[in-house]
Regions:
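Residue-level signal for short, function-critical loop segments
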Residues: 110-112, 259-260, 342
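Short, flexible loop segments at boundaries between secondary-structure elements
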Residues: 204-248, 288-293, 352-390
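Short active-site-adjacent structural elements
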Residues: 265, 294-297, 306-307, 343-349, ...
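A short, acidic, amphipathic alpha-helical segment used as a generic capping/interface helix at domain edges
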Residues: 311-334, 345
């Protein structure tokens, strides 16, 4: 082992986004991401890591989220969203925090709370939970302790991953909820779906998740007791439990990027598409060899979403950008949907460089735009403050 060999290892293991696309095509069935994970763990034991990974890990262990935000500041951010939502809907919603005896604990990546366009996805969660509380008396609570769904321990070591993951079960047990609902994230769900049960389980103090609104039993979460919000919302829509006005998303011509970990890591392929089709009038798929199990990555996963990696990120994301450009030129697509916080952080930069006419959105931003809330005022804008297409027509008259 020499310094030159260490440098070679470093360059190899920290240019892999752990997207696992290569494993789909490998004739020997080799999962390169698992090799990368072990290689990074060895490097981490030598003290070799990057700040964009190491600092969030330390922050998450210390305060519960990657940014090191204290509980009161986390609540303050959601209070800001409450004000924005009131401006748009005329309703003053009241999110629940750390509520013992709530039905469900909701945990999402902190990127949705602190960075655009994830903030609009976060507002989408809040609007959905308000609707479910008013219509069905469902109590979903946020935690200021387990305030991070993402797990950068996945990019350092299995032991760190286990420590950071443990706070979810600890908080669920403290609050006495029935089960856990998880937000739109990528590697968060690889950890939950493939590692969580053996890392920190069994979670026998929680119930097997059953929707109290539709009665659906979420068999995929029977072991972990944690349900993906896309599966939860798709089930609500399928059972006609949400009143939706698709026309509010007119003007958004949407395509969908299968985030690597929810697609290849857990098979969540149909639910996000179903939600988009039920909330938007215009949806187009990218070429078949660039989506679903064969999806291209954003180029910035596995902790590579840092400014000093910009050239690597833009090159790594070019295949995805090319597929977006294809549907943009063919169908006029102007909105790229996804269910991953790192995607929402990385894809705007990628689109700005390669396909600047296309914006990025989370799926639950689209849900909240379309959701008709009891007692709301007539909506004039979407969650971003952009005029609805119907309002633009009125202005023209």
């Amino acid at each position: 082992m020499t310094i030159d060999v260490l440098k070679e290892w470093w360059y190899y293991f920290f240019q892999c986004t752990e997207c696992r696309r290569c494993s789909v095509f490998c004739p020997y069935g080799i999962d390169t991401a698992e090799i990368t994970i072990m290689g990074r763990e060895l490097l981490n034991l030598l003290g070799l890591n990057i700040d964009w990974i190491a600092t969030p890990v330390a922050n998450c262990y210390r305060t519960g989220n990657h940014l090191g935000i204290q509980p009161h500041a986390f609540k303050d951010m959601l209070d800001f969203f409450v004000e924005d939502i009131e401006d748009i809907t005329g309703l003053a919603i009241e999110p629940s925090f750390n509520k013992k005896g709530a039905d469900i604990l909701f945990i999402t990546p902190s990127g949705d709370v602190f960075a655009d366009p994830g903030t609009y996805t976060c507002m989408g969660y809040m609007i959905l939970f308000h609707y479910l509380k008013v219509k069905y008396n469902l109590e979903v609570t946020w935690s200021t302790y387990a305030s991070e769904g993402g797990n950068f321990g996945f990019f350092t070591s299995h032991e760190t991953m286990k420590r950071l993951n443990s706070k979810m079960y600890a908080e669920a047990k403290r609050l006495g909820v029935k089960w856990i609902l998880g937000g739109e994230c990528g590697h968060m769900w690889r950890v939950i779906h493939q590692y969580m049960d053996t890392l920190n389980g069994p979670a026998d103090f929680l119930e097997t998740p059953v929707s109290p609104i539709t009665g659906t039993r979420f068999e995929n979460a029977a072991s972990t007791k944690m349900v993906h919000i896309a599966e939860f919302t798709a089930d609500l829509i399928k059972h006609n439990k949400l009143e939706l006005d698709k026309s509010r998303n007119d003007g958004k011509i949407v395509t969908f990027h299968d985030s690597c970990n929810p697609s290849r890591g857990m098979g969540l392929l149909e639910e996000p598409r179903y939600i988009i089709k039920e909330t938007c009038n215009q949806f187009y798929e990218m070429p078949s060899n660039t989506i679903r199990e064969q999806t291209f990555c954003c180029g910035s996963g596995a902790g590579l979403n840092a400014g000093e990696n910009m050239e690597l990120r833009l090159a790594g994301g070019l295949p995805r950008a090319n597929a977006v450009k294809y549907v943009h030129e063919k169908h006029g697509v102007n909105m790229l949907g996804c269910i991953c916080a790192i995607d929402r952080a990385a894809l705007p930069t990628l689109m700005e460089y390669w396909v600047p006419e296309v914006d990025v959105t989370g799926v639950h931003e689209l849900v909240a735009n379309a959701l008709v809330l009891p007692g709301e005022k007539e909506r004039e804008t979407d969650l971003r403050g952009d005029p609805l297409k119907s309002m633009e027509g009125d202005d023209a008259e």
